[in-house]
Amino acid sequence: MAAAPGVRRSELGDALRACRSAFIGVGLMSCMINLLYLTGSIFMLEIYDRVLPSRSIPTLVGLVILAGGLYVAQGILDLIRGRVLVRIGTSLDEALNARVFDTVVRLPLMVGGRNEGLQPLRDLDNVRSFLSSMGPGAFFDLPWLPLYLAICFAFHTLIGLTALVGAIILVTLTIITEFMSRAPAREAMGLAARRNDLAATSRRNAEVLVAMGMSGRLTKRWSEANEKYLSGNQRASDVAGGLGAIAKVMRMVLQSAVLAVGAYLVINQEATAGVIIAGSILSARALAPVDLAIAHWKGFVAARQSWHRLSRLLETLPAHTPPTLLQSPSKRLSVEAVSIVPPGDQKIIVQDVTFTLDAGNGLGVIGPSGSGKSSLVRALVGVWQPLRGKVRLDGAALDQWSSDVLGRHIGYLPQDVELFA
């Protein structure tokens, strides 16, 4: 499917669209599962309205065998649907993990220390975990709510109205859950990221912290950050858990209300005894997806926020375009009026440097600490992009080279060697 002119396609959206056939399969299985969910209601209706009045054992045996077969089919379909959703999450991860890892590596070279660290990888885990959970199944089941309500109305108008009122209450609770859980969940995830960044920074600088006696103060700062995270996570969990508990209670109240309405109709000879049980089972099933959606709403909110962060990140750092295939450099290094600003900074620390170095020659760069020697070297090997000017090898600018190809011809030893440490 081609994108419309002027419309920018999302990499996340493309990865999800690649699973379109799997989602269609999940939708078809959800259709069959929800039709099979009618088995219990119809079974009870037949038991009370046919088997008991006729006292027919063969009819009872036939109904039990038929219902058992339908329940087995429903269980198998539910199992397959769950496994397909797990594989959709895995497929999305496989399509994006290399790209997300690339952004984790490249982002510090663009924004310096003010980056998201490993958060993009955690975001991808959040999206995959939600897609692999029971949450998406609940959303696939929600569109079948009107069918169940229509059957309740077919039993009797009062039963249908009772189920409809319960549905309105639970859907309202779902909307309230969305508005009340969005901010606490976002706050909790931000606090978790800050806590993890502080722990990672402390680990990288362990020698300095111990040598200068700062480990106690950093531990105190981390404990304060952790307490804020725990408090925020508790608020988010309280909102989701509280509304989820209310939803469960309301579903049980609704089930009892349907039983009471059914009993009233039987007493007034407006319905049969089977309608009491069948209506109760059907109304409970109608609202089960709403109940399940509320229970998984916290995970949905977290996955949605992770999705938005990943989308912004991948748009900020587009994928590398295949560079021009060039011959191995062998003649000359040219630096043309290069000025350098460190990533995430505004101050120029190397300005208008120009020199040429032919093959076989060497050059030493000396100067006081902080004068920009390391910054110049980072630009010479392509780690940092110059603010102005060009660095060329055999006439080709460094950004025309593939880093994988160029790296074979460059030796680079940074001040802090931490690779695979």
Q: Model features per residue range: what roles?
A:
Residues A2-R9, V86-S129, N196-D197, M212-G232, ...:
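Extended non-transmembrane interhelical loops and adjacent amphipathic helices
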Residues V86, M214, D238, A286-L313, ...:
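Cytosolic ends of transmembrane helices, especially the final helix of ABC transmembrane type-1 domains
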